[in-house]
């Protein structure tokens, strides 16, 4: 029962996180394409001037990709994008963390001496993941731009390429990101609740069905100190 309850709670967190990440990606795409259409981030940095440097290098795929990435890096402030995504995911982390902590108390009766909180360390780990998410977005856009440049597309066609292809890619990523972020934060909340509740050990217990991996089945029943990996 406890396992089913936790799985239901996790799925609820994943759905909410996926909606949040999808909204961020949609807003980010609008900002990127608007900047592409205006041609510049500010008066001194012309996006299409940088792109055009790649359009004369159609024989060199590496040079085209480098030119596309250089132009993209100058298009918008990616540090601000990191900060925006961090603000977006903070409530996701908090909610999933608290859900994980509550599930341990409700299902196992483990009461913490004091309420666990999402620590600065966990937020810093989250910031690393945020930067990785935006780096992947940059890579995907740069790759799409490079393909368009190789195909001899106009600037308008390049913008259209991004508008048409990026949403599908980002939707798939949003699902994976939501699963990862919700699971990581729920596990962190559960672990913190057990620590604050005075637990000193943890025991690996499998679901006991045919879906259990051999490597996990061999760990069934193994007990280790709570702060050590299995």
Give the label of every model feature segment.
Residues 1-169:
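N-terminal leader/targeting and assembly helices and adjacent pre-domain segments
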Residues 169-230:
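Acidic, glycine-rich two-metal-ion catalytic cores of nucleic acid-processing enzymes
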């Amino acid at each position: 029962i406890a396992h089913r309850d936790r799985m239901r709670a996790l799925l609820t967190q994943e759905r909410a996180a996926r909606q949040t990440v999808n909204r961020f990606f949609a807003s980010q795409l609008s900002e990127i394409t608007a900047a592409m259409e205006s041609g510049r981030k500010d008066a001194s940095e012309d996006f299409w001037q940088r792109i055009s440097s790649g359009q004369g290098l159609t024989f060199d795929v590496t040079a085209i990709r480098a030119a596309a990435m250089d132009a993209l890096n100058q298009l918008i402030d990616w540090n601000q994008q990191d900060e925006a995504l961090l603000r977006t995911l903070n409530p996701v982390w908090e909610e999933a963390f608290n859900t994980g902590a509550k599930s341990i108390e409700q299902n196992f009766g483990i009461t913490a001496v004091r309420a666990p909180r999402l620590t600065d360390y966990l937020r810093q780990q989250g910031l690393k993941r945020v930067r990785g998410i935006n780096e992947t977005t940059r890579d995907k856009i740069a790759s799409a731009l490079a393909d368009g440049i190789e195909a001899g597309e106009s600037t308008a066609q390049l913008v259209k390429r991004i508008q048409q292809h990026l949403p599908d890619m980002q939707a798939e990523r949003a699902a994976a990101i939501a699963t990862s972020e919700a699971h990581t934060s729920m596990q962190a909340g559960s672990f913190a609740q057990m620590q604050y509740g005075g637990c000193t050990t943890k025991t690996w217990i499998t679901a006991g069905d045919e879906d259990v991996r051999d490597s996990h089945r061999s760990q069934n029943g193994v007990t280790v100190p709570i702060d050590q990996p299995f």
